[in-house]
């Protein structure tokens, strides 16, 4: 297609290079006044048909990425030429990050309005202004650019507050031909395949990021800094509604980083309602993701998570203010993997002050994590300095020198020079080639030098570093307020008498039939009966309010002594190891 029909074609993006840090509008403007492409003709034919069918007064374009920008402008251009009475506006991720300093008047030859950040209220006010004739020309607007008296102005004069996340309702897919979309796998990366192979209902657990401190991230913008979680009940209500509307039970939670506590409550709510769903999301590699929590997430239908290991160096992770260490990331990845959840990691190189030694050491960390089987997917990208991140706002603090340009159109990615003087781009091919092999489970024994055509320093990382991180002593501490959840059906019970040295006592064998295995434990008869009676109080489907560890201990000690000896005994540990008992 690219060679013969349209050089700008891409399955998930189109003419992306025109939108990437287009500080000037000239190149895009020139392209918009050149001959229409093959893809343009198809797009505009569909657009014209829809406009004639619906006859709208106002048309909005959501532009999340640079790869959507050209097509949005081409469609808006068509509308202005053929339906000049229709008003057009643009919102979405691209204007939210790139067009906050918009000065280019020619943009308004295509769009009447550009809205920023959460779109519900800005669009509602535009609708009232355009579609209700009784509204005056001086109608208030929310975070909106427009052209007035030949000048680009920004209006934010509405006193109305943005809608709360709980008030937004469920996405409406009613008019989309969901059965006609094709699934395309562009590259062999397991997580990228998951994104595009098949269709996912999109939802958000929380607006913004609960961490909101990473120095490479746009933490000064509302979409990151305004954190507002949604209750688990509302989220699962929306999931049920979407299943009914779309007939599909796959969900992608598109959070910046889903909060672990909320993920737990969502998982419990899914299981209580006995919903059969498949879901995945983005996370931070928090120590809160214990083995038991990961097992619960798996039970609820979680199949994958993606999170940032970034530079895989403790010094740089601290500089980034990521709030994690390589060891912590390794342990969390292990917990997810053992629960049967795929782990994808975002990997970064070229962060300010990063040395060549640290880049190679990062690669060695990644190699070991794939070799240990605790990472299944990853993607290297070179650090980009964005205008709204702490690095972009305070470059001198991070040892970088920005390239200052006059900006009239897009402003996000900033060209810069690192004071180390290292050309980090030279590592790109070697990092990606090695990762491709590691994801296929091969070439772990290859010296790191083989991935690069230039001399690299030898790694200083111990070859067993990740292995040693995962060696840990048995933890005999349980939080007093930890919820105790029983996830299985009741076991089969057989009583028998055990004799030893002239003594006899009553015993019970409890046999558990799980989805993937069958196992048994032996307990003293009276303790087995107590456990069977207690199951109803801690069973997932029986009661919305599970007992916590202290409650369970008190209940046990009404009948027996030494709860800790019972709780950390081999039979009960077997139940924990098989996910029958979870401590959350």
Name every feature range the model reports, one short phrase each.
Residues 31, 150-202, 516-520, 577, ...:
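N-terminal [4Fe-4S]-dependent radical SAM core
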Residues 16-164:
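Glycine-rich beta-alpha loop elements in corrinoid/cobalamin-binding modules
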Residues 1-10, 416-584:
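Radical SAM enzyme core and accessory elements
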Residues 171-342:
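Radical SAM [4Fe-4S] cluster-binding motif and immediate context
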Residues 66-70, 96-98, 123, 152-153, ...:
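Flexible loop/turn segments at secondary-structure boundaries
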Residues 1-56, 77, 81, 101-108, ...:
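Conserved Radical SAM active-site core
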Residues 111, 275-278, 282-461:
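A structural motif corresponding to the C-terminal lobe/cap of the Radical SAM core domain
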């Amino acid at each position: 297609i690219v060679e013969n029909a349209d050089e700008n074609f891409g399955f998930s993006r189109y003419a992306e290079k025109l939108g990437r840090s287009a500080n000037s509008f000239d190149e895009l403007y020139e392209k918009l006044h050149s001959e229409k492409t093959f893809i343009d003709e198809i797009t505009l034919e569909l657009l014209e048909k829809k406009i004639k069918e619906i006859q709208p007064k106002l048309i909005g374009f959501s532009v999340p990425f640079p790869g959507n920008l050209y097509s949005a402008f081409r469609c808006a251009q068509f509308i202005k030429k053929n339906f000049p009475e229709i008003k057009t506006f643009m919102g979405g991720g691209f204007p939210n990050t790139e067009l906050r300093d918009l000065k280019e008047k020619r943009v308004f030859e295509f769009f009447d309005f550009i809205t920023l950040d959460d779109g519900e209220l800005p669009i509602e006010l535009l609708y009232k202004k355009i579609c209700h004739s009784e509204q005056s020309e001086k109608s208030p607007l929310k975070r909106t650019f427009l052209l007035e008296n030949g000048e680009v102005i920004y209006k934010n004069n509405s006193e109305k507050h943005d809608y709360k996340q709980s008030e937004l309702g469920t996405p409406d897919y009613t008019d989309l031909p969901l059965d006609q979309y094709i699934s395309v796998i562009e590259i062999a990366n397991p997580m990228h395949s998951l994104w595009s192979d098949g269709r996912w209902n999109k939802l958000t657990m929380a607006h913004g990021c609960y961490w909101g401190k990473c120095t490479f991230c746009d933490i000064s913008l509302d979409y990151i800094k305004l954190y507002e979680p949604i209750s688990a009940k509302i989220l699962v209500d929306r999931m049920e509604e979407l299943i009914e509307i779309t007939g599909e039970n796959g969900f992608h939670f598109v959070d910046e980083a889903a909060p672990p506590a909320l993920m737990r409550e969502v998982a419990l709510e899914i299981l209580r309602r006995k919903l059969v769903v498949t879901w995945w999301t983005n996370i931070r590699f928090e120590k809160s993701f214990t083995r038991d929590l990961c097992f619960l997430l798996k039970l609820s239908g979680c199949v994958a998570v993606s999170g940032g290991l970034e530079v895989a160096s403790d010094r740089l992770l601290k500089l980034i203010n990521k709030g994690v260490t390589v060891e912590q990331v390794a342990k969390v990845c292990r917990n997810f993997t053992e629960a049967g959840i795929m782990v994808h990691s975002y990997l970064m190189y070229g962060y300010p002050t990063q040395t060549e030694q640290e880049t190679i050491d990062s690669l060695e960390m990644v190699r070991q994590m794939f070799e240990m089987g605790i990472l299944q997917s990853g993607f290297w990208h070179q650090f980009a300095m964005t205008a709204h991140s702490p690095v972009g706002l305070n470059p001198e603090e991070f040892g970088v020198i920005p390239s200052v340009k006059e900006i009239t159109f897009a402003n996000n990615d900033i060209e810069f020079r690192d004071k180390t003087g290292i050309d980090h781009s030279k590592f790109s091919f070697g990092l990606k080639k090695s990762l491709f092999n590691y994801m296929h489970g091969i070439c772990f024994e290859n010296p790191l030098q083989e991935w690069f055509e230039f001399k690299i320093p030898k790694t200083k990382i111990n070859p067993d570093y990740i292995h040693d991180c995962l060696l840990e002593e048995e933890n005999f501490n349980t939080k007093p307020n930890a919820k105790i959840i029983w996830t299985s059906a009741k076991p089969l019970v057989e009583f028998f008498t055990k004799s030893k040295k002239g003594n006899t006592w009553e015993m019970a064998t409890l046999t558990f039939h799980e989805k993937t295995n069958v196992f048994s434990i032996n307990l003293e008869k009276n303790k087995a009966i107590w456990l069977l009676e207690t199951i109803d109080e801690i069973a997932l489907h029986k009661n919305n309010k599970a007992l916590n560890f202290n409650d369970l201990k008190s209940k046990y000690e009404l009948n027996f002594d030494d709860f800790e000896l019972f709780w950390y005994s081999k039979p009960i540990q077997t139940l924990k190891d098989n996910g029958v008992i979870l401590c959350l």
